[in-house]
From Swiss-Prot:
Designated gene of the protein: pgk
Family: Belongs to the phosphoglycerate kinase family.
Gene Ontology molecular function terms on file: ADP binding; ATP binding; phosphoglycerate kinase activity
GO terms for biological process, alphabetical: gluconeogenesis; glycolytic process
Keyword set includes Mitochondrion: no
InterPro entries: Phosphoglycerate_kinase, Phosphoglycerate_kinase_CS, Phosphoglycerate_kinase_N, Phosphoglycerate_kinase_sf
Matching Pfam families: PGK (PF00162)
Catalytic function, reaction form: (2R)-3-phosphoglycerate + ATP = (2R)-3-phospho-glyceroyl phosphate + ADP
Keywords: ATP-binding, Cytoplasm, Glycolysis, Kinase, Nucleotide-binding, Transferase
Keyword set includes ATP-binding: yes
Residues annotated for substrate binding in this entry: D21, L22, N23, R36, H59, L60, G61, R62, R113, R146
E.C. no: 2.7.2.3
Protein name: Phosphoglycerate kinase
Length: 392
């Protein structure tokens, strides 16, 4: 269903309330990764340049709802935005009571989670937010899977509700990757547990041509193929499920390829010695931490021949260099592949940054949970309400 886009509206002189995802990591009050702030900049600048009175709201961390806590204040973000925009960005602590904003100016609303009722999508709170604006812009893809007052409720009651450029771009890229993909469609799903990504694996295994699994997830599939995984992280209770998923994928003409060689260690540490082994030679004392070079080469060939690639999660413990070669090889293969590629999820973005392939991945998603729920085929509440408003 279509949604209204901010780019289609005349914003001049209008009070525009934008929900961004500025939930950035902080250390001693300093921002350690500004990716989300930079991703939101084009939307904010577009509204300011159009002569709108711009108000931006976001959450930060997980404070006790309804209570101010300086550790979760957006003050560092306001300072950072001032620096990037080259003009003062005021932080408004009691913004729900209304605030004066000039045309072309930006005010940052203090952490939405300091308001009681935010997470529960409280109607009275949502109406207060809606009363602040002429146009509400949902631009926080990273929070689109949450039905909260600042992502969902406000869109119900604002005079006009639309999608910002970042959200619109995410939906377009994900649609291109999953709704009408160029084939073969290859997905990489890494991570420690099958249980947390089971619905993603089930959903993707039915639509992709090849599903490459990595990390602890791969260990469960290796165990399902009756190989010893030693002391590796895996889920014994989901071995049967992994077997069924692989069989179903193969019956549908696809596959979940398994490693032929792996890199093992005896302890989880950056000093652990990396030992290369054939998959059938893993001992009871071993822990599998990465895929081996032969497997990397095989998976890289699959990626280079793909039409579309969806990447969510590393295939090894890449934060330790000796167990990062597999993830590095796949990152470089994705970069070299002519396929349309989309990467999402925190660990994935860290791998993209570590191996310097950001410019060669077609689209980098800012969403973690929202990215996964989209992959599961779930309706995102914040998008659903925009569709509903557009059809009224």
């Amino acid at each position: 269903m279509p949604i209204l886009k901010m780019s289609e509206l005349d914003l001049a002189g209008k009070r525009v309330l934008i929900r961004e995802d500025l939930n950035v990591p902080l250390k001693n009050g300093e921002i350690t990764d500004d990716t989300r702030i930079r991703a939101s900049l084009p939307s904010i600048q577009q509204a300011m340049q159009a002569g709108a009175k711009v108000m931006v709201m976001s959450h930060l961390g997980r404070p006790t709802e309804g209570e101010f806590d300086a550790a979760f204040s957006l003050a560092p973000v306001a300072g950072y935005l001032s620096h990037l925009l080259g003009q003062e960005v005021r932080l408004a602590p009691d913004w729900l009571e209304g605030m004066a904003v000039e045309k072309g100016q930006l005010v940052l609303c203090e952490n939405v989670r300091f308001n009681r009722g935010e997470k529960k999508n409280d109607e009275a709170l949502a109406k207060k937010m809606a009363a602040l604006c002429d146009i509400y812009v949902m631009d926080a893809f990273g929070s689109a899977h949450r039905a909260q007052a600042s992502t969902h409720g406000v869109a119900k009651y604002a005079p006009v509700a639309c999608a910002g450029p970042l959200l619109a771009g995410e939906l377009e890229a994900l649609g291109k990757a999953l709704e009408n993909p160029a084939r073969p469609l290859v997905a990489i799903v890494g991570g420690s547990k099958v249980s947390t990504k089971l619905t993603v694996l089930e959903s993707l295994s039915q639509v992709v041509d090849q599903l490459i699994v990595g990390g602890g997830i791969a260990n469960t599939f290796i165990a399902a193929a009756d190989y010893n995984v030693g002391k590796s992280l895996y889920e014994a209770d989901l071995v049967g499920t992994a077997k069924q998923l692989r069989t179903a994928a193969q019956e549908g003409g696809g596959d979940i390829p398994l490693p032929v060689d792996v890199v093992c260690g005896q302890e989880f540490s950056e000093n652990a010695e990396a030992v290369l082994k054939r998959i059938g030679k893993v001992t009871d004392e071993d822990m599998i931490f990465d895929i081996g070079p032969e497997t990397s080469k095989h998976f890289a060939e699959i990626l280079k021949g793909a039409g579309t690639i969806v990447w969510n999660g590393p295939v090894g413990v890449f934060e330790f260099d000796q167990f990062g070669e597999g993830t590095k090889a796949l990152a470089l293969a994705i970069a070299e592949s002519p396929a349309f590629s989309i990467a999402g999820g925190g660990d994935t973005l860290a791998a993209v940054a570590k191996y310097g392939v950001g410019d060669q991945v077609s689209y980098i998603s800012t969403g973690g949970g929202a990215f996964l729920e989209f992959l599961e085929g779930k309706q995102l509440p914040a998008v659903a309400i925009l569709e509903e408003r557009a059809s009224q």
